Amino acid sequence: MAIIHDIVSAKQQARKLLVLLVDPEKQDSLAAMGSLLCLPDMIFVGGSTGAYSQACLSQLRAHTDRPILLFPGNIAQFTPTADALLFLTLLNARTPEVLIIPHIQIAQQVLQSGIEVISMGYILIDGAHQSSVERATHCTPIPQSDSAMILSTAIAGQLMGKQLIYLEAGS
């Protein structure tokens, strides 16, 4: 529970955190980043495709001591060697293949691994072009102009026990 405690503590103190999102498919650029990897408070590793995260994690560990959190696009990206797992739920998805089936498939492995699990609601927002998340999930993004729907979706996630909410406008 250490990482979620650090995030909540920062929020309570009105302290900002910088998070770097690294896509395992683009890990060849990590070595070039070198000392820049010490700048973020934590690093998320994940992407919309099936790229495996372990090699990326190993490369990151060679360059930084920052906490590394899995931000998986699918269950194949799970590895218990990360510091925490962001257990993502795409809140504006409408199919069980996105909403719950992957969670059921990986639940026992996650629990047995002992990894810190942070429940995160993920909201896809229209970024003016079709994102890789939209293509992978067939989820319809919420229009940026519909702030009431975005807020209601975030509140619904909070009421369902999501510890964090992530807004995605495309990648």
Q: Residue locations for each model-derived region?
A:
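Conserved N-terminal beta1-alpha1 strand-loop-helix module at the mouth
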Residues: 1-63, 138-164
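Hydrophobic faces of well-ordered beta-strands that scaffold small-molecule active sites
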Residues: 16-22, 41-45, 68-70, 85-87, ...
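Short, ordered loop/turn segments at secondary-structure junctions
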Residues: 25, 47-50, 73-75, 90-91, ...
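Catalytic cores of alpha/beta
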Residues: 31-35, 70, 74-87
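Glycine-centered flexibility motif
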Residues: 46-47, 56, 97, 121, ...
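Alpha-helix-loop-beta-strand connector modules within alpha/beta enzyme cores
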Residues: 54-74, 106-118, 171
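Conserved anion-binding
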Residues: 77-154
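Short, structured loop/turn "capping" segments at alpha-beta junctions
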Residues: 130-135, 161-167
